[in-house]
Amino acid sequence: AVVFDPQPALWAEADTQLEP
């Protein structure tokens, strides 16, 4: 997840949890 983009980072983290 990117630090300078909090919102997209949330989706990125969720995506990794859904598809490890």
From Swiss-Prot:
Its main location: secreted. Residues 1-20 are annotated as: Disordered. Keywords: Glycoprotein, Immunoglobulin domain, Secreted. It is found in: Secreted. GO terms for cellular component: extracellular region. Plasma. It comes from the Eukaryota. Glycosylated. Interacts with CRISP3. This is Alpha-1B-glycoprotein. It comes from Equus asinus (Donkey). The lineage of its organism: Eukaryota, Metazoa, Chordata, Craniata, Vertebrata. The gene is A1BG.
